[in-house]
UniProtKB/Swiss-Prot annotation:
The organism's place on the tree of life at top rank: Eukaryota
Entry's Gene Ontology BP terms: adult walking behavior; eating behavior; histamine metabolic process; hormone-mediated signaling pathway; negative regulation of feeding behavior; negative regulation of glutamate secretion; positive regulation of gamma-aminobutyric acid secretion; positive regulation of insulin secretion
Signal peptide: 1-24
Gene: Trh
Tissues with expression: Specifically expressed in hypothalamus and testis.
Organism listed in the record: Mus musculus
Statement: the UniProt record of this protein carries the keyword Manganese: no
Lineage: Eukaryota, Metazoa, Chordata, Craniata, Vertebrata
Name assigned to this protein: Pro-thyrotropin-releasing hormone
Record-level Gene Ontology MF annotations: thyrotropin-releasing hormone activity
């Protein structure tokens, strides 16, 4: 009977002696956590320098790329308002256009309002014998060498050239078009001498009179009308001879 009681007494002693120690340990741990909550751990100490190094590397790379991007990427501009490089502008102000020395248009213009360029703008200062470009048409080259003045761009139907003797000043109807009055007169004279018939005036398809007594091939007068009445009477007589029954049937109501 003494054994169980002895074991229970020992257990109670151990429990009573261990409680103060555990409480003391818990209090010490809480005090340490309250005293050093902001102190960084080992991992945080290692991460901060890495971030600083990465930030410096990114700044250096961005600085290198910024200089390159300024020269590579330019703003998209209108074709007629494209700005020239600063080097070309400075060279043009100095009068040095480079080895080629060609004239470059500053602004794109409307085809019908393009200003005529002077001789000096198309050629070098030292060139005295200047010729227009070879891609121009022949009639333009002929007019250039004949010192004909350049005219303003006109409507296709009202285009007149100073180097032409007979100008087409107004667009005409296809059936009434007379390009050269002298050629028209000569053609009419030759037709009159040969005795041929002149072509009649162009008419509307629904109003065109062909074979009329008063037409171009007929004679409008008393003789023509009498001839027309005679033809009508002859036609009625022939119809009566061919159908006597019809004639009798037509006369019956008249006799009654």
């Amino acid at each position: 009977m003494q054994g169980p009681w002895l074991m229970m007494a020992l257990a109670l002693i151990f429990v009573l002696t261990g409680i103060p120690k555990s409480c003391a340990l818990l209090e010490a741990a809480q005090e340490e956590g309250a005293v050093t909550p902001d102190l960084p751990g080992l991992e945080k100490v290692q991460v901060r320098p890495e971030r600083r190094f990465l930030r410096k590397d990114l700044q250096r790379v961005r600085g290198d790329l910024g200089a390159a991007l300024d020269s590579w990427i330019t703003k998209r501009q209108h074709p007629g308002k494209r700005e020239e490089k600063e080097e070309d502008v400075e060279a043009e102000e100095r009068g040095d256009l480079g080895e080629v020395g060609a004239w470059r248009p500053h602004k794109r213009q409307h085809p019908g309002r393009r200003a005529n360029q002077d001789k000096d703008s198309w050629s070098d200062e030292g060139d005295s014998d200047w010729l227009p470009p070879s891609w121009l048409p022949d009639f333009f080259l002929d007019s250039w060498f004949s010192d004909a003045p350049q005219v303003k761009r006109q409507h296709p139907g009202r285009r007149s050239f100073p180097w032409m003797e007979s100008d087409v000043t107004k667009r005409q109807h296809p059936g009434r078009r007379f390009i050269d009055p002298e050629l028209q007169r000569s053609w009419e004279e030759t037709e009159g001498e040969e005795g041929g018939l002149m072509p009649e005036k162009r008419q509307h398809p629904g109003k065109r009179a062909v074979g009329h007594p008063c037409g171009p091939q007929g004679i409008c007068g008393q003789t023509g009308l009498l001839q027309l009445l005679g033809d009508l009477s002859r036609g009625q007589e022939t119809l009566a001879k061919q159908t006597p029954q019809l004639e009798a049937w037509v006369r019956e109501p008249l006799e009654e």
